């Protein structure tokens, strides 16, 4: 897990709010599945978290209910402000119901080795990004967040996006007018925030075991969207390879090189645009 989390940290300012977001994470999840098979003896496939199924009560999801077959549940309750402000707007929603260390399920009392970078922002690479800072795995499950922003209606809005530019905007920015104007809280971010704490760390979220299920769902949505118009959508690209195009960088093309550090050899965008070409051989159910 540390190798994957460190890789995510290293490329955070390239792989979010950019033209390589979908493609980079597609191969990242595939690498995780391969690693589970080659190093851990896993014989199954990479599951995805269908956000809509748990949107109304995330704590009851078999993924997050704290049972022996879950990915652990909520963190222990801690004192928190009762409402969360969705900055930079004045909109508030109730906060989560946990917030502390996870002490239930298979990942109870798990120690994370990389630092908490949740306050680092997205302007500069944090100088302490790879410091050894052991701390507990935390969650703050929030059904108010999930029901408002990761429902089936939100998934349908993504799948009905008319272009790759619209799909990118719809997954990153909410449909709520004030939030969309602020360019925040699309289903991708909202799912992170509905789990909270470790998963809500922009840089180190892969330290939450559910990260790969979440991004398999992101990949599933992209794949299903592509399948609705494969002739035009399989190769559809938009954007650059830097977050919010900071600093300014060239538009991505099918020849743009993607890198994952020591986890993988580099790939071109062309090699990761389809789940059924080059080194990929999988598909998602509708």
Swiss-Prot record:
Pathway in which this enzyme or protein is active: Secondary metabolite biosynthesis
Amino acids binding Cu cation A: 16, 25
GO molecular function, one term: monooxygenase activity
Binding site for Cu cation B: 215
Gene3D superfamilies found in the cross-reference section: Di-copper center containing domain from catechol oxidase
Keywords: Copper, Metal-binding, Monooxygenase, Oxidoreductase
Cofactor: Cu(2+)
UniProt biotechnology annotation: Hancockiamide D displays potent cytotoxic activity against murine myeloma NS-1 cells, suggesting a potential antitumour application. More interestingly, hancockiamide C, the likely end metabolite of the hkm pathway, shows potent Arabidopsis thaliana seed anti-germination activity, but is inactive against the monocot Eragrostis tef seed, suggesting that it could be a herbicidal lead targeting monocots. The herbicidal activity of hancockiamide C could be due to its phenylpropanoid-like structural features, which may act on the plant lignan pathways, and hence warrants further investigations.
EC number: 1.14.-.-
Disulfide bond annotation, renumbered to this chain: none
Cofactor, how bound (note): Binds 2 copper ions per subunit.
Superkingdom: Eukaryota
Family to which this protein belongs: Belongs to the tyrosinase family.
Cited function: Oxidase; part of the gene cluster that mediates the biosynthesis of hancockiamides, an unusual new family of N-cinnamoylated piperazines. The NRPS hkm10 and the NmrA-like reductase hkm9 are proposed to convert two molecules of L-Phe to the intermediary piperazine called xenocockiamide A. Xenocockiamide A is then converted to hancockiamide D via a series of hydroxylations and O-methylations.
Listed name of the protein: Oxidase hkm6
Organism listed in the record: Aspergillus hancockii
Lineage: Eukaryota, Fungi, Dikarya, Ascomycota, Pezizomycotina
């Amino acid at each position: 897990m540390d190798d994957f989390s460190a890789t995510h940290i290293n490329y955070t300012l390239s792989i979010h709010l950019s033209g390589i977001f979908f493609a980079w994470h597609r191969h990242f999840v595939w690498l995780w599945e391969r690693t589970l098979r080659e190093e851990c003896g896993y014989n199954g496939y990479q599951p995805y978290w269908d956000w809509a199924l748990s949107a109304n009560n995330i704590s009851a999801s078999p993924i997050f209910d704290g049972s022996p077959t879950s990915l652990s549940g909520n963190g222990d309750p801690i004192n928190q402000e009762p409402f969360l402000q969705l900055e930079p707007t004045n909109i508030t929603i109730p906060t989560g119901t946990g917030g502390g260390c996870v002490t239930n399920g298979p990942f109870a009392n798990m120690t994370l080795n990389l630092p908490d970078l949740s306050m680092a922002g997205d302007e500069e690479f944090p100088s302490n990004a790879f410091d050894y800072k052991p701390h507990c795995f935390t969650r703050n499950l929030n059904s108010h967040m999930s029901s408002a922003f990761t429902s089936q209606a939100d998934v349908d809005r993504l799948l009905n996006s008319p272009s790759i530019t619209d799909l990118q905007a719809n997954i990153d920015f909410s449909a709520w007018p004030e939030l969309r104007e602020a360019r925040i809280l699309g289903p991708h971010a909202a799912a992170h925030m509905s789990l909270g704490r470790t998963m809500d760390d922009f840089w180190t979220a892969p330290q939450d075991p559910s990260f790969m299920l979440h991004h398999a769902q992101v990949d599933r949505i992209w794949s299903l969207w592509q399948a609705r118009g494969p002739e035009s959508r399989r190769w559809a690209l938009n954007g650059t390879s830097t977050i919010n195009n900071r600093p300014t960088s060239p538009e991505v093309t099918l020849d743009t090189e993607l890198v994952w550090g020591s986890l993988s050899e580099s790939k071109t965008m062309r090699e990761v645009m389809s789940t059924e070409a080059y080194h990929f051989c999988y598909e998602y159910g509708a």
